């Protein structure tokens, strides 16, 4: 939620309300962690986040229930250390 606030998708302190009611689920306004994040599939520390974003942008390489319809832009972000480093990658569909 803090990252969504920091990226400007919602105002500071409004992250909790922003994610309610499925807004960040696969069929929502802003799908987040469509592959489950670090709890499910990110064992290569971030690389699987990149491959997931590319697959989503290609539009035909993930299971139908996880596919974001008409995905045009993907943001991959990650933290390192004790939240002392951060990296972001913005990808776009061709």
Q: What do these predicted regions represent?
A:
Residues 1-94:
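Claisen-condensing/thiolase-fold acyl-transfer catalytic domains that form or cleave C-C bonds
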């Amino acid at each position: 939620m803090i990252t969504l606030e920091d990226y400007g998708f919602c105002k500071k302190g409004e992250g909790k309300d922003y994610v309610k009611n499925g807004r960040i689920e696969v069929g929502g306004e802003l799908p987040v962690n469509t592959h489950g994040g670090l709890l499910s599939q990110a064992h290569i520390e971030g690389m699987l986040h990149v491959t997931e974003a590319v697959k989503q942008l290609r539009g035909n390489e993930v299971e139908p229930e996880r596919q974001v319809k008409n995905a045009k832009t993907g943001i991959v972000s990650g933290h390192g250390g004790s939240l002392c480093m951060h990296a972001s990658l913005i990808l776009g569909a061709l």
